[in-house]
Amino acid sequence: MVGLGLSYLLLPKQRQWITTIQRYVVLLLVAILILSPFLWLVSAVFKDTDVLMQYAFLPPLSEWSSETLNLKNFYNPETEELDSLFEAEKTIEGEVHFWRYLANSLFLASTSTIVTLFFSSLGGYALAKYEFHGKYAIISFMLGTMMIPGLLLLAPLYNLIYKIGWMDSYWALLVPGASSAFGMFLFRQACLSVPNSLMEAARIDGCSEFSIYLNIVMPLVRPMTGAFCLVSFLGNWNSFVYPNIYIQTQSKLTLPIILNQFVDVYSQQYGIFLA
């Protein structure tokens, strides 16, 4: 009761400051909780396996030395090369730099995201703003395909890719995912909120249909575009099954496949694997 009575004695501005401080304290605690795994990963890459098992994060300052904290997971002092991390000679035949795998993953994730964004946004825009025969049947069919697990189509898709001759080619990864039913549904829902009056005014001013889509509609659904790009990029970046099946040349492998190979070779060298 005393605390409750004191709260009424505070000025509105003081109560607002207290509320703001409490809010920031809660957010800070949540941020620390979320960042803890990442901070542990960053600290682990600078430690040997023995030190990693002994200390959860960094060792005490009194024990900091080149033996407890070093760059051996990145740098081999004997050869003076970055072969601890950037070479995978023990997992695959030949020498392919780690940067090549990283570049392959970036290329596939970025290209697939851009292509999927273009076709999905076009499809969602058409389904939201145009009236044509069979429109709602297409929407129902599109929603139905979202309930089918992607791995269920793996065998027929593999057969199709093999007959086309796209095995060991990035086309096998880019073309099947060029349009996303989930993406078209999201953009359709976003485009429904765009007033038709803006589109009519643009048509009166002489804008083409594609210009309306590009210059009127897309800027208004920018939040949806950002969210879709983030989800699509992360999905393509973490893709493992399809690249592992279709890609056979070592220089075309992606980062998740190489990291999976590192699990076997570096199963007890957690520092190198985490790096």
What are the functions of these language-model segments?
Residues M1-S7:
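Membrane-embedded alpha-helical segments of integral membrane proteins
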Residues L10-A275:
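A structural signal for multi-pass alpha-helical bundles of membrane permease subunits
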